[in-house]
UniProtKB/Swiss-Prot annotation:
One of its GO terms (biological process) is viral budding from plasma membrane. Most abundant protein in virion. When expressed alone can form virus-like particles in transfected cells. This is Matrix protein 1. It is a peripheral membrane protein. Residues 1-164 are annotated as: Membrane-binding. It is found in: Virion membrane; Host nucleus. Homodimer and homomultimer. Interacts with NEP. Binds ribonucleocapsid by both interacting with genomic RNA and NP protein. May interact with HA and NA. Cannot bind NP without genomic RNA. Its main location: virion. InterPro entries: Flu_matrix_M1, Flu_matrix_M1_C, Flu_matrix_M1_N, Flu_matrix_M1_N_sub1, Flu_matrix_M1_N_sub2, INFV_M1. Keywords: Host nucleus, Membrane, RNA-binding, Viral matrix protein, Virion.
Length: 252
């Protein structure tokens, strides 16, 4: 796996799924391929994106700044600086300085990532802030190692809370989660549908599923009534894909 592929993988792992994620993936690919070099416009676009947390925006801004060739005097952006200040915690700043000194001795991406993984996400973000504010310099490879370690820390905690939700025994949460997933699947079916006959059929199935979820939410139902709803939808979607000659490995 190339270095940039690895960076893209880690960065996208902390972006919530949805149309915005696809858009960010495209921007990252363009930046890494040298097709998009207008850092000013990229940062303006990033600043106004909804849904993303300030830290995710800060990390993306840091990656864009590292990758785009920019004028030396180009102003640093406040929204990135604020996100990478380690919540203003002096403890994070102390650790960030110690980490920075260690990173100065590293020359490889993997070496930097290994060193960085033993620090908290707050200290890692502060260290990125030091580099972003030009208070310290490391090689681009080392900076990318720091980015990936930060994303791994964040993705780990996200995965943990996601797993807690999936394994919860609370029937109300499980029921709501099934309905949310059914709605999301219905949306995906509508987006994939082209203009063929089968597309109309897929739209119909998706629309029915949405109406069912809406009705269940309006009148309130027994928590077990949604069991199988998402699975039925997925079966319909996979059957539709086969007829259309589209194969999605794991659509879950």
């Amino acid at each position: 796996m190339s270095l940039l592929t690895e960076v893209e993988t880690y960065v996208l792992s902390i972006v919530p799924s949805g149309p915005l994620k696809a858009e960010i993936a495209q921007r990252l690919e363009d930046v890494f391929a040298g097709k998009n070099t207008d850092l000013e416009a990229l940062m303006e676009w990033l600043k106004t994106r909804p849904i993303l947390s300030p830290l995710t925006k800060g990390i993306l801004g840091f990656v864009f700044t590292l990758t785009c060739p920019s004028e030396r005097g180009l102003q640093r952006r406040r929204f990135v600086q604020n996100a990478l200040n380690g919540n203003g915690d002096p403890n994070n700043m102390d650790k960030a300085v110690k980490l920075y000194r260690k990173l100065k001795r590293e020359i490889t991406f993997h070496g930097a990532k290994e060193v960085a993984l033993s620090y908290s996400a707050g200290a890692l973000a502060s260290c990125m802030g030091l580099i972003y504010n030009r208070m310290g310099t490391v090689t681009t490879e080392v900076a990318f190692g720091l980015v990936c370690a930060t994303c791994e820390q964040i993705a780990d905690s996200q995965h943990q809370s996601h797993r807690q939700m999936v394994t919860t025994t609370n029937p109300l949460i499980r029921h709501e989660n099934r309905m949310v997933l059914a709605s999301t699947t219905a949306k995906a079916m509508e987006q994939m549908a082209g203009s063929s006959e089968q597309a109309a059929e897929a739209m119909e199935v998706a629309s029915q599923a949405r109406q069912m979820v809406q009705a269940m939410r309006t009148i309130g139902t027994h928590p077990s009534s949604s069991a199988g709803l998402k699975d039925d939808l997925l079966e319909n979607l996979q059957a539709y894909q086969k007829r259309m000659g589209v194969q999605m490995q794991r659509f879950k």
